């Protein structure tokens, strides 16, 4: 059985943050990430620290953030113990990299990725640990070839870890990034997994490395293809309207957002995923046979790619 190595995970996650920021800056060609390093002393709630990095007003990206955090607490919040009651009364550590990129151009999809590690410990008992993460894509004006490329890259990431891993984590992603009150998925999905500890520690760790590094391989070629596509006010207005769904999901359903807010996490870092602008419109209906209608008809429901 492989040894649990928290320090190795932390070091890797910090390197992954550096690597992803570098590649996104290269793709943007103008903006750089501004780092806000933070630290909290342990107290009644979360202690720890992190590096919040935000990019604004680039050539390609209107706003985006790539966060690293490593926090500790004496008791898990309700959002975590609700489905894992055995965690009650254990001190815990949580560390991860989380990112969201909101592009200017409506033809470039919004993207999200996350890899994380949790460990909950109690004197005299075996630790409870798991990994989680994934990446998902939210296009406004989807192209079939882009969606297939995204999912084919996800399949390649999963292939070394088992024949059924992609299918399982793709289905989990479709289920997780779903807005019941809207009856639609947030986007076209990708990969999502949580509570990953059924393999040995080293294999689980290798999998989150593959997912973390696979994100840029899946996303940047799509950005490169679409970032110079011409668009007008109509496309921009629709992009802002659809960003509203992103806000709704993150504030109502997202487990990471709820965990962070309920456990007293750093609010500015938690809400970094919010788009800089979004809009809502009462009783919006896309025009029949329009590109906007195509999004609803063909892409906001689970599909096999």
UniProtKB/Swiss-Prot annotation:
Its cofactor is a divalent metal cation. Substrate binds at residues 98, 114-116, 264-266. GO terms for cellular component: cytoplasm. Involved in the heme biosynthesis. Catalyzes the aerobic oxidative decarboxylation of propionate groups of rings A and B of coproporphyrinogen-III to yield the vinyl groups in protoporphyrinogen-IX. InterPro entries: Coprogen_oxidase_aer, Coprogen_oxidase_aer_sf, Coprogen_oxidase_CS. It is found in: Cytoplasm. PROSITE patterns: COPROGEN_OXIDASE. Keywords: Cytoplasm, Heme biosynthesis, Metal-binding, Oxidoreductase, Porphyrin biosynthesis. Its EC number is 1.3.3.3. Pathway: Porphyrin-containing compound metabolism; protoporphyrin-IX biosynthesis; protoporphyrinogen-IX from coproporphyrinogen-III (O2 route): step 1/1. NCBIfam families: PRK05330.1 (NF003727). GO terms for molecular function: coproporphyrinogen oxidase activity; metal ion binding; protein homodimerization activity. This is Oxygen-dependent coproporphyrinogen-III oxidase. It comes from Vibrio vulnificus (strain YJ016). The active site is at residue 112. The keyword Heme does not apply. Pfam families: Coprogen_oxidas. GO terms for biological process: protoporphyrinogen IX biosynthetic process. PANTHER family: COPROPORPHYRINOGEN III OXIDASE, MITOCHONDRIAL (PTHR10755), OXYGEN-DEPENDENT COPROPORPHYRINOGEN-III OXIDASE, MITOCHONDRIAL (PTHR10755:SF0). SUPFAM superfamilies: Coproporphyrinogen III oxidase. A divalent metal cation binds at residues 102, 112, 151, 181. Residues 246-281 are annotated as: Important for dimerization. The record marks 181 as: Important for dimerization. It catalyses: coproporphyrinogen III + O2 + 2 H(+) = protoporphyrinogen IX + 2 CO2 + 2 H2O.
């Amino acid at each position: 059985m492989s040894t649990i190595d928290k320090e190795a995970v932390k070091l890797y996650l910090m390197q992954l943050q550096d690597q992803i920021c570098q590649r996104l800056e290269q793709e943007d060609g103008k903006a750089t990430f501004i780092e806000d390093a933070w630290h909290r002393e342990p107290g009644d709630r979360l202690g720890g620290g992190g590096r919040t990095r935000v990019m604004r007003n680039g050539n390609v990206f209107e706003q985006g953030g790539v966060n690293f955090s490593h926090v500790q607490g004496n008791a898990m919040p309700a959002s975590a113990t609700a489905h894992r009651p055995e965690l009650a009364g254990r001190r815990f550590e949580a560390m991860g990299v989380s990112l969201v990129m909101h592009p200017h151009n409506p033809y470039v999809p919004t993207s999200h990725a996350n890899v994380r590690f949790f460990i909950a410990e109690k004197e005299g008992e075996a630790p409870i640990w798991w990994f989680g993460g994934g990446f998902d894509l939210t296009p406004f004006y989807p192209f079939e070839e882009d969606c297939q490329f995204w999912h084919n890259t996800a399949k390649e990431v999963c292939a070394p870890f088992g024949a059924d891993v992609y299918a399982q984590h793709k289905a989990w992603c479709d289920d997780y990034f779903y807005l019941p009150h809207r009856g639609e998925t947030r986007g076209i999905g990708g990969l999502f997994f949580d509570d990953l500890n059924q393999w040995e520690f080293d294999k689980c760790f290798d999998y989150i490395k593959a997912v973390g590094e696979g994100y840029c391989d899946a996303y940047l070629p799509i950005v490169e293809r679409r970032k110079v596509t011409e668009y007008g006010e109509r496309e921009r207005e629709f992009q802002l309207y659809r960003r509203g769904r992103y806000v709704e999901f993150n504030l109502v359903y997202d487990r990471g957002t709820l965990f962070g807010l309920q456990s007293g996490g750093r609010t500015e870092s938690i809400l970094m995923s919010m788009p800089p602008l979004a809009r809502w419109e009462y009783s919006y209906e896309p025009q029949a046979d329009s590109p906007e209608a195509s999004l609803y008809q063909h892409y906001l429901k689970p599909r096999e790619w």
